[in-house]
Amino acid sequence: MSARLFIALTIMSAGAQGQTAKQLRTTWGEPDLQGIWNGETLTPLQRPARVANKPVLTPEEAAKVEADVAGRPGRNARAERGTEKDVAGAYNQIYAQRGTRLADRRTSLIIDPPDGKIPPLTPEAQKRKDAVREYMQALLQRTSGGKPGPPSLRHNEPPPFYNVDRLNRADGPEDRSLMERCLAGTLPKLDAHYRMVQSPGQVGITVDWGQGSGFVRTIPVDGSKHLPASIRSYKGDARGHWEGDTLVVDITNFSPKSDYLGSRQNRHVVERFKRVSENRLEYTVTVEDPTTWTRPWTAMEPLEKQSDKENQIYEADCHEGNYGLMDMLANTRAAEKLFKEEKGPNPRTMDIATGGGVDPADQKYSFGRAGAE
């Protein structure tokens, strides 16, 4: 091949790539964010202590993490049959989304603060957390997952705040967790699948996360103002606008019945969606709540485009909540009846919260799930 022909082909190739980038726009001229985007990742939300001084892994370290995860056996076999732990582990890993790659070798999705950690709780938030923990532990007393002693009299008390966790009680649906009630989806939502569609003045996002925890969002991008502060919802009130090629979504008006890492109605979320190439979209989110954290924090998650022909995101159906919750409440009423007739144990001595001893108010995660370390 002559040098002149090689240069001509190189220029044509560069021009074609540039043209492709320009074509990633809708027919009405906005950046095209549409498609199915995969956010599954092995990168945790917070940086684990063992890599506290290493924001980015080496290629060799990242490859080892991916190989170690790939080599872990799935939860396909039951253990300790007949125990509460066995019942709590009724699923194998096919029901749980687990990433297989460290997309950009970072050790945390959080990029600010630089230490990759969620900022400390405010004194007010710590008091809330302690109050909830004490209440939940009191309800576990005398069970396999709690301290010894007689069942606590706090079983007769309402929770200190609107309950979002699994209490060791089933007096009514409000005693069960938001996930059991099919209300688990909240914002921000990381480590998920997204179907994005656009029309003039609106962006729609279908979120698929875990088992029955998805939801649908419709975001106005028309310059409209937020709803009055008196109108609250689980997903908040979202309003979008464009800053160059970045879609910025401002979310306020969260319900006090929603929860994200202890933050409720005072949560303020700002999302940024930017398509950086044909197959990659950067999702950056800043979370602020002066009643929960001492400062705002920001996370960035790379999203990879998936084939529309080979993949589909369906509406999330939470059938467990539709059917299982009623059965759970009915079973508790039956257990109470048997106890009253001296034919069964006191239901308050049965652990229906932790699955056998793990404090649900103190869940921790590391590599393999975008949650708190």
Per-segment meaning from a language model:
Residues S2-A8:
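Sec-dependent signal peptide recognition
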Residues S13-G15:
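N-terminal signal peptide c-region/cleavage motif recognized by signal peptidases
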